[in-house]
C-alpha cells in the first residue's frame, strides 16, 4: 500500500504584533495504513518542560480539533489510537493503526512562561 504524508506545522505563539516560534516539529512524517507513527515536538524548560502539552489535528478546510490535552488525556470522542506523552522538554503524539483519514496537519502547543508579562 502506498504511504501518505502526515503534514506537520510549527506552532507559533503570538503576543501583540509579534510572533515567536518556540516549539519545533519535523516538517513531515509519513506511514502506511496500519502502521504506528510518532510525531515529535521539542521545546525548552520554559514551555514543555514546565507546562502541559496539547495536540491538535487540522483536516483540510476545517478548524483545528483538540486531540490531546494535559500531555496525555484524550477528549471524549477521540479514538484511543491517538496517544500523547511528555519527557523533559520534548513531547510526542503517537498514532497507531494509521488510517487514510489521519492525513492532516498536527500541531503541538504549550504555554511558554517567558511570554508572560
UniProtKB/Swiss-Prot annotation:
Region span, Complementarity-determining-3: 109-117
Broad class of where this protein is predominantly found: secreted
GO BP field: adaptive immune response; immune response
Record's subcellular location: Secreted; Cell membrane
Name of the protein: Immunoglobulin lambda variable 1-47
GO CC annotation: blood microparticle; extracellular region; immunoglobulin complex; plasma membrane
Residue ranges of the region described as Complementarity-determining-1: 45-52
Alphabetical list of PROSITE patterns matching this protein: IG_LIKE (PS50835)
Framework-1: annotated segments: 20-44
Keywords: Adaptive immunity, Cell membrane, Disulfide bond, Immunity, Immunoglobulin, Immunoglobulin domain, Membrane, Pyrrolidone carboxylic acid, Secreted, Signal
InterPro entries, sorted: Ig-like_dom, Ig-like_dom_sf, Ig-like_fold, Ig_sub, Ig_V-set, IgV_Light_Chain
MF terms in GO: antigen binding
Region (Framework-3): 73-108
SMART domains assigned: IG (SM00409), IGv (SM00406)
Disulfide-bond pairs as recorded: 41-108
Function: V region of the variable domain of immunoglobulin light chains that participates in the antigen recognition. Immunoglobulins, also known as antibodies, are membrane-bound or secreted glycoproteins produced by B lymphocytes. In the recognition phase of humoral immunity, the membrane-bound immunoglobulins serve as receptors which, upon binding of a specific antigen, trigger the clonal expansion and differentiation of B lymphocytes into immunoglobulins-secreting plasma cells.
Taxonomic placement: Eukaryota, Metazoa, Chordata, Craniata, Vertebrata
Amino acid at each position: 500500500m502506498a504511504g501518505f504524508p502526515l503534514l506537520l506545522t510549527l506552532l507559533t505563539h503570538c503576543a501583540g504584533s509579534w510572533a515567536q516560534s518556540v516549539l519545533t516539529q519535523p516538517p513531515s512524517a509519513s506511514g502506511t495504513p496500519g502502521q504506528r507513527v510518532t510525531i515529535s515536538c521539542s521545546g525548552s524548560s520554559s514551555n514543555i518542560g514546565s507546562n502541559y502539552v496539547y495536540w491538535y489535528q487540522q483536516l483540510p478546510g476545517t478548524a483545528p480539533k483538540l486531540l490531546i490535552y494535559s500531555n496525555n488525556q484524550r477528549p471524549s470522542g477521540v479514538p484511543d489510537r491517538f496517544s500523547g506523552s511528555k519527557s523533559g522538554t520534548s513531547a510526542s503524539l503517537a498514532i497507531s493503526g494509521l488510517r487514510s483519514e489521519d492525513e492532516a496537519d498536527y500541531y503541538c502547543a504549550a504555554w511558554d512562561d517567558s511570554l508572560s508579562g
